[in-house]
Amino acid sequence: MAYSKIRQPKLSDVIEQQLEFLILEGTLRPGEKLPPERELAKQFDVSRPSLREAIQRLEAKGLLLRRQGGGTFVQSSLWQSFSDPLVELLSDHPESQFDLLETRHALEGIAAYYAALRSTDEDKDRIRELHHAIELAQESGDLDAESEAVLQYQIAVTEAAHNVVLLHLLRCMEPMLAQNVRQNFELLYARREMLPLVSTHRTRIFEAIMAGKPEEAREASHRHLAFIEEIMLDRSREESRRERALRRLEQRKN
């Protein structure tokens, strides 16, 4: 009986696959700088030429970017599928924000569910840290800081779900999500009596994730976004009433 020769994988191929996996699962984040070549070769326990070959191939694939004298970075444009013009277009059509909220219902509910089910101690530490950052920003009345903390909190929850497709969907949506969160906070800061209720909703999501209760986390996420949607609808109705009143006033003048 003839046996085929077992081919050992090329070392640079193994390194390439490992780095690809770290990018895919989100361990290496967009824009993140890789350790220096010498240090990275030591961590992988490989030769520098093999590492260099793997990095060159990942650079050719568009996953890494090497800057002369500045190191090697994960491409920051990997998840920027929704371009600035599209974000601007959506902002010019307020009704699209309701479509985005519906999408957030689905994605954030799933993320909260699986974060409660799968989050590690390190994931929970990160989520806890960002939840506290949101509280501090709200206490100081810093709209910009609170909007950014909420965005980073949602990214951390999605990372804790350990679903690479879900994470990369969120990364693609990040510019739109950032704008939506910001607009929602502008509305909430104009109706400050609503802020404590929003905080209560978010705390329920946080506590369910920390307690490992996936169904409660998902339901709390849905209730939170439904509340935001209701506030947006109230504003839309108020604006419609104001426009009708102005039209009547103009008619009387004429």
UniProtKB/Swiss-Prot annotation:
MF GO annotations: DNA binding; DNA-binding transcription factor activity
Function: Transcriptional repressor for the pyruvate dehydrogenase complex genes aceEF and lpd.
Residue ranges annotated for the HTH gntR-type domain, each copy included: 9-77
Protein name, UniProt field: Pyruvate dehydrogenase complex repressor
Presence of keyword Iron-sulfur: no
S-S pairs: none
Cross-referenced CDD domains: WHTH_GntR
Species of origin: Salmonella typhimurium (strain LT2 / SGSC1412 / ATCC 700720)
Entry keywords, A to Z: DNA-binding, Repressor, Transcription, Transcription regulation
SMART domains: FCD, HTH_GNTR
DNA-binding region: 37-56
Alphabetical list of PANTHER family matching this protein: PYRUVATE DEHYDROGENASE COMPLEX REPRESSOR, TRANSCRIPTIONAL REGULATOR, GNTR FAMILY
